[in-house]
């Protein structure tokens, strides 16, 4: 049986999904919230915090020791204070929402005189303040300086070791040069690379390259050790006659050409010149061939593997790695050498690269090698042994400067084929040798290079990790200053507080949150854009890629993106592919790699057991698609199944499948999963569709989509714009700005308040100037459960995301007005305010302290008519509710003017009338051009120490009254609850003492009615246990009263204190204007399928094409916009939308005709459960009252959900719905011309489509100017709307006039109409005087030209006759 929540049962969305939901959509913001919680560990006790986030940052820096190591500052733990203001207050005051961080430290001082380290004293610290740490709001944002910001997660290259090649680009020969790179989380990069001559080099931090053997030698390896580690050996025996025998190991020769006859038992097994195949090798092993006589040519040219030493004299005959010649072999015979070893080097997987490199290496000792590295890192400085050693040790072997991190070590060990995933954060000798070995193996053809775009090699760095890095930088800066001060700590008796300077830590954190590239101004256009912004993954930013350098491969969709990053949603333009969106079900694992859920398949049966796999693990398994056909037991019905294995799509037998996708929408992001019939749209248009949904402006009346995907509710619930019940209960009271809930008894903690008050956000400005407004959905007496929706926010309708409006659309041309994607709309759409939006503009007026005196905000403004001041109050600030237009004064402000010498008459007037108009000028805040609206809010901020004006006091009183009202309601409900419990306790009890009653009487209702509830607590019963309970209740009531009173006083004190304003600012007034914008020509609109266009004309309703029943269409779109764009989803949406509205219309008709409830239930059951394969809706679970309410809400249309890749089928669903709605199954009908009444020739596709109005409004773009500002240098008009610019007659326009020889026009354009300053003022004068003469002068641009030529050192001047 289906259970519906309070809001779900009011409007049930019919779902066409044929597959059961195995895994609910996870909380969409969990990545941000979990990451930051891990960083703070705010609610974890100090002793039990894990080593991550802040804790790890502190532990990595502390203890800080003095230079002589006799004093050390140790870290004990940290805790957070209470934030000074809550989120809303921070937004209003323009401050950061943060909590003070306090750290407990201890100072340990050791005894200098004792030989062993002996503690002399310990200075325990009370907590030390370490700056404010911004807190995350419940919705995953930060409030920084009053504005909401989001920290976008970064996709960066995982630390570890990577093997690659240059793809033949590095050298003109086109030879592939292999390389390896060890990337730490923190520290120097180490690159190993081959050059064209097959020598191996290394680079540290991309500097000059050195031979790899220098690095190996600096690690302490000798020549002999290097050869032993990297090469196999061949042993040769010499007899006195000079015959050479090879100790034969057949495996060493596999795949080579035999350079001599290989003989066994007197027969030739492999003749010279034949390839030694694996068959021959097997034969030789079977025959146990142990030695072969080889010709001298075979040995000549080989390299000695070990030093050859004369055993008698101890003299070195030949050093290892020397080439053997015939002369040397003869000498060996003479010296009686019986045996020598050579390096096994051949073309067949045993390259001699390292030996070649070693021969070029001129260093011989470890010290020389380290000195060479020192010279490379610090050119120009003479290397000493100490300096060289300390630099080399610090590069890769010092934990303070080098850290591979847990991820890096895991990736490193995996890459080298080691079993364990844990290990040290620094490199070891074995690590570097292992990397060189693998690089040589790859060069020899064993093993492959890494794909750096594979999501197993890129990881997510979330908010918490980035904040930790910023904090660590601050701590490192702090460490330097502490180290210097520690020496004085003992002698001067300093405490930890004296040692620590908070500034560097606070500055580092503040810099990260306010100016990092990844700390972005939140996109608050609508709820979807907020959610998407928090789920965005960027490859840009510090330590990431740059737009210019990123190539095509990085931006492209990779097979590992499946279920992790959305292949559709990414911006168009220079950032394409660099900014991605998290897929619906994706999450990060402990190492920061993205993982996606799969259902486990056991013995060919799909189970409901969910396992998350990262890209590293996924390639090992065979994974079936979510649309594979299963029987009722979960077994695959088809023999061959479409699967993914090793990043390839293949068909596999069902017995080999190990996992199966969780859901068809697994691969897309939240925005793409909101597009119905996405599977029928071309990818490019789907990309535009998902991006444009984020630009939809919340309309005045939100309208749920008739055709959705079922994700609308999930997005709205997780976005944070709705008000959800924290605890279940009964609605006590509701008005437009707050909801009071009396909480269920079983959800109230002992002694807790049984009341929740939700203050709604009313007409508040968002970051994008759209309007945030919440409207209640509940009525007094409603019963709600935890998590139910109490109030809708912007762009939500009954708890579902509603970005646009359902409008009746026809696809047909109409007089060329829908040419090139133009959109023709009916006047009705505009009249009914379907796409009317409210925008809130913030205008600020600042009164500063100037040199000539303070600026003043007042209504006493010089030279201003009375009528202009009509909308201002006595303090000079506009009233809330005033309707203002361009040029109106919002805040009256006067600024002192410089004193000028006054004439005797002025002095006399001033002496008589005290006239002060002359020494101040009007600098009021006025409504800017092209704006008109209603004042919805005014905020006054006053500096501390300056008296607040009347308006500021009135605003303060309003805020305090609102808090008082909340507290009064909380007390009322709490008291009523306690009194109710007291009454139940007292009734029927034997009295010991009570007014007007004798001892022994029982308490009855009459007694309770005669006395006040406060008196009940003074009654005494004969049962002492009851008296104790009464006393406890009385105490609880008093405690709660005091607690709420204290809270009220605290809030009151906050409001009455002054504001923290910028230096020199005395007062600041912010005025908020609500601007109503109707849909008009020039506005951009779009559907959800990337079908965008601009409104071209608003046509009267009577002229619009209409249907046979007389219904005029709302919008006419061009049919030519569909075939070439290949977004057929919009046509299917049109048909299903028509069916949905038609079904609603039929239901409304039945209700109006008074059909019995049984018939309505039967009809709706036929609609909701028409296809047994689809999700079943249990309408019988609804009571009659709930059912009637559902019917009333479905009159406008029955909302449908067609989930992506699992939606409505054309024949069995779409046509069935159209038939049920009694509409043509083709989805087309005849239309009539509204102007002539004639029928159009052929049928037209008509239906309901969900259209959005985008944030590109014509009002923000259109702009006109007569006169305005000019550029100072050229005296030509400025450009652009923001500067109130105009048209400039530029060089190309001049060429056009020159081409026509229009010399007089040209002269006029270049002089009096443009930048001839004197000429244009004279011309104005002449026009006023009626004298129509032009006197052209010298254009200012000419002066600019002469100045520029003079700057080149050429003296140029204009001689005038």
Curated annotation (Swiss-Prot):
Keyword Transcription: yes
Cited Gene3D superfamilies: 2.40.50.100, 2.40.50.150, 3.90.1100.10, DNA-directed RNA polymerase, subunit 2, domain 6, RNA polymerase alpha subunit dimerisation domain, RNA polymerase Rpb2, domain 2
Catalytic reactions of this protein: RNA(n) + a ribonucleoside 5'-triphosphate = RNA(n+1) + diphosphate
Pfam families: RNA_pol_Rpb2_1, RNA_pol_Rpb2_2, RNA_pol_Rpb2_3, RNA_pol_Rpb2_45, RNA_pol_Rpb2_6, RNA_pol_Rpb2_7
CDD domains documented for this protein: RNA_pol_B_RPB2 (cd00653)
Domain of life where this protein originates: Bacteria
GO cellular component terms attached to this protein's record: DNA-directed RNA polymerase complex
GO molecular function: DNA binding; DNA-directed RNA polymerase activity; ribonucleoside binding
Transmembrane segments: none
InterPro entries noted in UniProt: DNA-dir_RNA_pol_bsu_external_1 (IPR019462), DNA-dir_RNA_pol_su2 (IPR015712), DNA-dir_RNAP_su2_dom (IPR007120), DNA-dir_RNAP_su2_hyb_sf (IPR037033), RNA_pol_bsu_bac (IPR010243), RNA_pol_bsu_CS (IPR007121), RNA_pol_bsu_protrusion (IPR007644), RNA_pol_Rpb2_2 (IPR007642)
Alphabetized NCBIfam families for the sequence: PRK00405.1 (NF001616), rpoB (TIGR02013)
Family statement: Belongs to the RNA polymerase beta chain family.
General function of this protein: DNA-dependent RNA polymerase catalyzes the transcription of DNA into RNA using the four ribonucleoside triphosphates as substrates.
Protein name (record): DNA-directed RNA polymerase subunit beta
Organism of origin: Dichelobacter nodosus (strain VCS1703A)
Species classification: Bacteria, Pseudomonadati, Pseudomonadota, Gammaproteobacteria, Cardiobacteriales
């Amino acid at each position: 049986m289906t259970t519906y929540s309070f809001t779900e049962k009011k409007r049930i969305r019919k779902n066409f999904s044929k597959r059961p939901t195995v895994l609910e959509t996870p909380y969409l913001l969990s990545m941000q919230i979990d990451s930051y919680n891990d960083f703070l560990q705010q609610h974890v006790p100090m002793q039990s915090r894990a080593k991550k986030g802040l804790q790890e940052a502190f532990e990595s820096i502390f203890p800080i020791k003095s230079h002589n190591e006799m004093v050390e500052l140790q870290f004990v733990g940290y805790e957070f204070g209470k934030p000074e203001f809550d989120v809303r207050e921070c937004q209003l005051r323009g401050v950061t929402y943060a909590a003070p961080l306090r750290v407990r430290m201890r100072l340990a001082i050791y005894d200098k005189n004792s030989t062993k380290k002996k503690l002399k004293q310990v200075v325990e610290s009370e907590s030390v303040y370490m700056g404010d740490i911004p807190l995350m709001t419940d919705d995953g944002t930060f409030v920084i300086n009053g504005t909401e910001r989001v920290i976008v997660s970064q996709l960066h290259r995982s630390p570890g070791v990577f093997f690659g090649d240059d793809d033949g680009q590095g050298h003109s020969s086109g030879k592939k040069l292999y390389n390896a790179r060890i990337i730490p989380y923190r520290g120097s990069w180490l690159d190993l690379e081959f050059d064209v001559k097959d020598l191996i080099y290394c680079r540290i931090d991309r500097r000059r390259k050195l031979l790899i053997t220098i690095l190996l030698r600096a690690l302490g390896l000798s020549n002999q050790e290097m050869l032993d580690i990297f090469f196999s050996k061949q042993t040769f025996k010499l007899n006195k006659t000079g015959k050479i025998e090879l100790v034969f190991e057949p495996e060493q020769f596999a795949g080579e050409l035999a350079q001599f006859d290989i003989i066994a038992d007197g027969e030739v097994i492999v003749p010279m010149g034949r390839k030694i195949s694996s068959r021959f090798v097997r034969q030789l092993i079977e025959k146990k061939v142990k030695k072969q006589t080889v010709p001298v040519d075979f040995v000549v040219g080989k390299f000695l593997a070990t030093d050859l030493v004369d055993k008698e004299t101890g003299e070195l005959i030949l050093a290892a790695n020397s080439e053997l010649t015939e002369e040397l072999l003869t000498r060996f015979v003479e010296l009686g050498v019986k045996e020598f070893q050579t390096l096994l080097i051949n073309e067949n997987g045993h390259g001699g690269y390292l030996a070649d490199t070693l021969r070029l290496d001129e260093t011989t000792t470890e010290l020389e090698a380290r000195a060479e590295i020192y010279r490379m890192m610090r050119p120009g400085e003479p290397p000493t042994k100490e300096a060289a050693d300390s630099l080399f040790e610090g590069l890769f072997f010092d934990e303070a400067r080098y850290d591979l991190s847990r991820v890096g070590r895991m990736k490193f060990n995996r890459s080298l084929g080691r079993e364990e995933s844990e290990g040290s954060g620094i490199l070891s000798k074995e690590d570097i040798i292992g990397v060189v070995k693998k690089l040589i193996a790859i060069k020899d053809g064993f093993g492959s290079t890494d794909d750096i775009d594979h999501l197993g090699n890129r990881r997510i760095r979330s908010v918490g990790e980035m904040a930790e890095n910023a904090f660590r930088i601050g701590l490192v800066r702090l460490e330097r200053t502490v180290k210097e001060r520690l020496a004085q700590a003992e002698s001067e008796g300093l405490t930890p507080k004296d040692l620590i300077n908070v500034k560097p830590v606070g500055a580092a954190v503040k810099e990260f949150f306010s100016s990092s590239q990844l700390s972005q101004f939140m996109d608050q256009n609508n709820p979807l854009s907020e959610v998407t912004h928090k789920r965005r993954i960027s490859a840009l930013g510090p330590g990431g890629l740059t737009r210019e350098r990123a190539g095509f491969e990085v931006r492209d969709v990779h097979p590992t993106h499946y279920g992790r990053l959305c292949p559709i949603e990414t911006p168009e333009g220079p950032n394409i592919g660099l900014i991605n969106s998290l897929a619906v079900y994706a999450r990060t694992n402990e190492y920061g790699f993205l993982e996606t859920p799969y259902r486990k398949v056991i013995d060919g049966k799909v189970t409901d057991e969910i396992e998350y796999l990262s890209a590293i693990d996924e390639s090992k398994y065979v994974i079936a698609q979510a649309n594979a056909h299963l029987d009722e037991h979960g077994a695959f019905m088809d023999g061959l199944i479409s699967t993914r294995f090793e990043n390839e799509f293949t068909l596999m037998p069902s017995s080999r499948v190990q996992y199966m996708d969780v859901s068809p929408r697994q691969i897309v992001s939240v925005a793409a999963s909101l597009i119905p019939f996405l599977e029928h749209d071309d990818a490019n248009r789907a990309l535009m569709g998902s991006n444009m949904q984020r630009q939809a402006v919340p309309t005045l009346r939100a309208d749920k989509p008739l055709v959705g995907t079922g994700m609308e509710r999930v997005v709205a619930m997780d976005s944070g714009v709705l008000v959800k019940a924290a605890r279940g209960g009964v609605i006590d009271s509701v008005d437009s700005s707050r909801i009071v809930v009396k909480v269920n008894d079983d959800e109230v903690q002992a002694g807790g308040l049984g009341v929740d008050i939700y203050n709604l956000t009313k007409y508040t400005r968002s970051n994008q100037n759209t309007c945030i407004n919440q409207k209640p959905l509940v009525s007094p007496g409603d019963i709600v459960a935890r998590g139910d929706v109490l109030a809708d926010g912007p762009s939500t309708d009954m708890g579902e995301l509603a970005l646009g409006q359902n409008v009746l659309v026809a696809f047909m041309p109409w007089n060329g007005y829908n040419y090139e994607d133009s959109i023709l709309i009916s006047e009705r759409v505009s009249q009914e305010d379907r796409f009317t939006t409210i925008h809130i503009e913030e205008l600020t007026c600042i009164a500063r302290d100037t040199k000539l005196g303070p600026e003043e905000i007042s209504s006493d403004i010089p030279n201003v008519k009375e009528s202009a001041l009509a909308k201002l109050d006595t303090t000079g600030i506009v009233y809330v509710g005033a309707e203002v237009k361009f040029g109106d004064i919002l805040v009256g402000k006067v600024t002192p003017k410089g004193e000028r010498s006054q004439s005797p008459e002025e002095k006399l007037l001033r002496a008589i009338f005290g006239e002060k108009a002359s020494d101040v000028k009007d600098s009021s805040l006025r409504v800017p051009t092209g704006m008109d609206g209603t004042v919805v809010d005014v905020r006054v901020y006053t500096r501390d120490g300056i008296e607040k004006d009347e308006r500021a006091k009135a605003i303060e009183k309003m805020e305090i009254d609102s808090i008082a009202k909340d507290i009064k309601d909380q007390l009322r409900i709490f008291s009523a609850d306690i009194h109710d419990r007291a009454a139940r306790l007292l009734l029927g009890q034997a009295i010991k003492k009570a007014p007007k009653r004798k001892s022994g009487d029982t308490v009855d209702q009459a007694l309770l009615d005669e006395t006040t509830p406060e008196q009940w607590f003074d009654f005494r019963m004969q049962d002492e246990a009851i008296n104790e309970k009464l006393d406890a209740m009385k105490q609880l009531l008093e405690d709660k009263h005091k607690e709420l009173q204290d809270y009220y006083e605290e809030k009151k004190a906050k409001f009455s204190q002054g504001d923290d304003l910028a230096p020199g600012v005395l007062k600041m007034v912010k005025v908020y204007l609500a601007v109503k914008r109707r849909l008009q020509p020039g506005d951009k609109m779009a559907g959800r399928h990337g079908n965008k266009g601009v409104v071209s004309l608003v046509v009267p309703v009577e002229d619009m094409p209409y249907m046979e029943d007389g219904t005029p269409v709302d919008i006419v779109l061009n049919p030519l916009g569909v075939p070439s764009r290949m977004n057929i989803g919009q046509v299917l949406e049109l048909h299903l939308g028509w069916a949905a509205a038609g079904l609603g219309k039929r239901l409304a008709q039945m209700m109006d005709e008074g059909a019995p409830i049984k018939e309505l239930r039967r009809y709706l059951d036929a609609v909701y459960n028409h296809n047994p394969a689809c999700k079943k809706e249990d309408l019988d679970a609804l009571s009659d009252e709930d059912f009637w309410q559902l019917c009333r809400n479905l009159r406008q249309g029955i909302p449908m959900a067609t989930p992506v890749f699992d939606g409505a089928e054309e024949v069995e669903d779409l046509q069935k719905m159209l038939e049920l709605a009694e509409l043509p199954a083709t989805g087309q009908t005849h239309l009539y011309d509204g102007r002539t009444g004639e029928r159009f020739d052929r049928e037209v596709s008509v239906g309901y489509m969900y259209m959005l109005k985008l944030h590109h409004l014509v009002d923000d773009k259109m702009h006109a100017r007569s006169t305005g500002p000019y550029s100072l240098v050229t005296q030509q008009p400025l450009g652009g709307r923001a500067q109130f610019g105009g048209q400039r007659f530029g060089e190309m326009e001049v060429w056009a006039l020159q081409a026509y020889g229009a010399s007089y026009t040209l002269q006029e354009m270049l002089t009096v109409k443009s930048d001839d300053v004197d000429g244009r003022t004279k011309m104005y004068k002449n026009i006023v005087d009626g004298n129509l003469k032009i006197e052209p002068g010298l254009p200012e641009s000419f002066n600019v030209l002469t100045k520029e030529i003079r700057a080149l050192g050429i003296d140029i001047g204009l001689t005038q006759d």
